Amino acid sequence: GLFDVIKKVASVIGLASQ
């Protein structure tokens, strides 16, 4: 669902920001 996509994007952003 859309929320799953949002969580996936958030995870990628989290990894990239570290």
UniProtKB/Swiss-Prot annotation:
Record InterPro entries: Aurein_antimicrobial_peptide
Signal peptide as annotated in the record: none
Tissue: Expressed by the dorsal and submental skin glands.
Keywords, comma-separated and alphabetical: Amphibian defense peptide, Secreted
Single biological process term from Gene Ontology: defense response
Subcellular location: Secreted
GO CC terms, sorted: extracellular region
Protein known as: Citropin-1.1.4
Primary subcellular site in the record, as a coarse category: secreted
Pfam families per record: Antimicrobial20
